[in-house]
Amino acid sequence: MKIISCKSIIVSSLLALSATATAGSFNDISWTLENEDNLPETDASGCALKPSTSTSTSKTFEFGLTDDSNCLDGKQRDEFKYQRRTGYNRLTGYFTIDGNYSDFNKMGVAQTHDHSTSDTGVFSIYQVRKENGSYIFGVQGDSNYSNNGWSDHPQVKISLDTRYELIIKTNGLPNGNSYEDANLYLDDVKIWSSSIEVGGEEKQYKKIGAYQLTGGEGEFHVKWDSVKLYTGK
């Protein structure tokens, strides 16, 4: 698996992009901003505070699995969940991982779900893993599809205390035909791209925040800002 160094970010990014298979196309899609029509709610099993204003889609959110956030006591997630959507939908936003909590591994920052993710459906976890002292960003998809495992997708080295833009585009279709594309940017330069072949139900929802994966450990704090949701046609 090609791991990209931020020192050669532009050249290496092209190599990673060429290694990505495309499950479907998002060309010529017209996107409409949802604004207050898709406000986030607290994940029922998490400990994030529900936003209280209609401008929450553009606010800055802090998520943490830390000793001082009361999210390590039997909680493995601190996330916001957006409403279900069918067809074309898109999430854009910027995340920054707090370098004060650097001793972590296997933490998710964004996800796409339908309600039966353990068996079928869109199930993508955009995550950061610590490998040999480096922080690696990548994705794993629905485990029913062998080409959607973590090691089968491009990965890129990222830095803590650095603001990255993540754009996730999904087309929720029936009969196992759904698909998703995602891109990661640093200073408006695309450094990573991947596609998920997911199948499953057409109604899905996006999540952002801090999520401890199986085998994950350590304290983790991430900030999201300028989060926007779109529908497409």
Swiss-Prot record:
Transmembrane segments: none annotated. It is found in: Secreted. Residues 1-23 form the signal peptide. GO terms for cellular component: extracellular region. Keywords: Lyase, Secreted, Signal. Its main location: secreted. One of its GO terms (molecular function) is poly(beta-D-mannuronate) lyase activity. Its EC number is 4.2.2.3. It catalyses: Eliminative cleavage of alginate to give oligosaccharides with 4-deoxy-alpha-L-erythro-hex-4-enuronosyl groups at their non-reducing ends and beta-D-mannuronate at their reducing end. The keyword S-adenosyl-L-methionine does not apply. Belongs to the polysaccharide lyase 7 family. This is Alginate lyase. The gene is aly.
